[in-house]
Amino acid sequence: MDPNCSCSTGGSCTCSSSCGCKNCKCTSCKKSCCSCCPVGCSKCAQGCVCKGASDKCTCCA
């Protein structure tokens, strides 16, 4: 059970608007959580919910 998520891993939850789930790996959640990319990175917004600003974003790799 994720302490920041109202469901157990693989269960049903919503992570669409915020990243309360640490890993956001519930089956009902279509997007994963990651750090926000710097302005100008178009890849980050796809399939990802931003959890905070970061200059080193793995979504951009």
Curated annotation (Swiss-Prot):
A divalent metal cation 2 binds at residues 7, 13, 15, 26. Residues 1-29 are annotated as: Beta. It holds the Pfam family Metallothio. A divalent metal cation 3 binds at residues 15, 19, 24, 29. A divalent metal cation 5 binds at residues 34, 36-37, 50. Residues 30-61 are annotated as: Alpha. GO terms for cellular component: cytoplasm; cytosol; lysosome; nucleus. A divalent metal cation 7 binds at residues 50, 57, 59-60. GO terms for biological process: cellular response to cadmium ion; cellular response to chromate; cellular response to copper ion; cellular response to zinc ion; detoxification of copper ion; intracellular monoatomic cation homeostasis; intracellular zinc ion homeostasis; negative regulation of growth. PROSITE patterns: METALLOTHIONEIN_VRT. A divalent metal cation 6 binds at residues 37, 41, 44, 60. A divalent metal cation 1 binds at residues 5, 7, 21, 24. Keywords: Acetylation, Metal-binding, Metal-thiolate cluster, Zinc. One of its GO terms (molecular function) is zinc ion binding. The modification N-acetylmethionine is found at residue 1. A divalent metal cation 4 binds at residues 33-34, 44, 48. It comes from the Eukaryota. Belongs to the metallothionein superfamily. Type 1 family. Metallothioneins have a high content of cysteine residues that bind various heavy metals; these proteins are transcriptionally regulated by both heavy metals and glucocorticoids. Class I metallothioneins contain 2 metal-binding domains: four divalent ions are chelated within cluster A of the alpha domain and are coordinated via cysteinyl thiolate bridges to 11 cysteine ligands. Cluster B, the corresponding region within the beta domain, can ligate three divalent ions to 9 cysteines. This is Metallothionein-1. It comes from Rattus norvegicus (Rat).
